[in-house]
Regions:
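Acidic, Gly/Ser/Thr-rich repeat motifs that build Ca2+-stabilized beta-propeller blades
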Residues: 1-96, 145-148, 152-160
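Beta-propeller domain segments
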Residues: 6-8, 84-201
């Protein structure tokens, strides 16, 4: 790989893994080393072969997220039960979110997305006909790691730009706008990247 944040970014087991021998994976598709390499973020299924290793010939893409730039890909993937999964997706890259994806609910960039996986296909879980039906939480820059605790609270690690590295704690199904790119942490986003003097809270 010749660019940052490339390759395999996330993996989760199919809930019926013992029978299906299937995993869900999240990765950046291979792109050229020349130019921006704005390759798509891919969600796919893959099977374990008879050798006990992943069989590349069984990869089946399920969803592709167009990445306008080469960084902020997110990609973390966890199962939460009932055949449902959370998928972290970055804002598409570059600085200051130039396309305003973090505050745009019509696409999945800058979000924690929620989907179900059944019979080899994915489906949205949310009843959302006005915006992207997969978006659960938005306003994120690059949620590359997160975890669900025993109280159904999501701990979301979001990579900051100039001043704040965020850990957001939110209820699983209580949809939240986490601020980016209007806010970075507790302060307004400014083009100059000027940070408040007291930035640890």
């Amino acid at each position: 790989r010749c660019h940052m944040e490339q390759g395999l970014l996330g993996m989760a087991f199919d809930e019926d893994f013992n029978t299906s021998r299937t995993l869900l994976i999240s990765y950046i598709e291979e792109g050229s080393c020349d130019g921006p390499n704005d390759s798509d973020l891919i969600l796919a299924s893959i099977k374990i072969g008879e050798s006990g290793l992943l069989d590349p010939s069984t990869i089946s893409p399920l969803r592709a997220i167009e990445q306008p730039y080469r960084n902020h890909n997110g990609g973390h993937l966890i199962g939460i039960g009932d055949n449902q999964y959370l998928w972290g997706i970055g804002d598409g890259g570059s600085a200051n979110d130039p396309i305003n994806n973090g505050q745009n609910n019509s696409n999945s960039l800058g979000s924690i997305s929620l989907f179900s996986y059944l019979n080899g296909e994915i489906f949205p879980v949310l009843n959302n006909t006005e915006n992207d039906p997969y978006v659960l939480h938005h306003g994120l820059r690059n949620p590359w790691r997160f975890s669900l605790d025993d109280n159904n609270m999501i701990w979301i690690g979001d990579v900051g730009q100039n001043c704040w590295e965020e850990i957001n704690l939110v209820p699983l199904f209580e949809r939240k706008n986490l601020g980016w790119s209007i806010k970075e942490g507790f302060q307004d986003v400014e083009e100059g990247g000027v940070c408040d003097e007291n930035i640890v809270q």
